[in-house]
Amino acid sequence: MFLVKYPLDRICVKSGVLCPNCQRKVESGEVAREEIPIMKALMELEEDLKELRTGNYIKSFDFGDEVIVILKGDWDKVSLDKIAKELSSRLGKSAKVLLEGEGVKKLMEQLLYPATILGINTLWLPDGSEQMVVRIPRRDRKYLKGKEEKYRRFISTILGKDIKITFE
């Protein structure tokens, strides 16, 4: 049976006691301490969901009321939605599961779904920095109501660039 690969040892995550190697990864910032409960929930889900038995765990982000998990593998939309639903019920908060490795636009489409992305532009500022502008139809603003800043911070964290979301 194949299992999802995690950056920390399974025993450390399940027990909550980190070995020196895992402790180093947490202290260096490679893995955030907030990711450990999310990894634990995913490991528990592997026993119930056969969809979750392959692939790699990349990263997760906890925004208080919502969790965003990035996985790498060959899952379809239905499987990702099923994983997200089960993870939501285990963690007691909303969860989104995204696939990594399909490009910036695809990652943003998954994150901002059901909002449609009209385009992504790069804006070079006079100080030499870059800003990505994500253009979304005005009619889809309702899907991001109250979450614009959260998604902007999330995308900025992943890409290492300043992000602006505009509605046209």
Roles of regions detected by a PLM:
Residues 1-143, 147-168:
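RNA-contacting regions in translation and RNA-metabolism proteins
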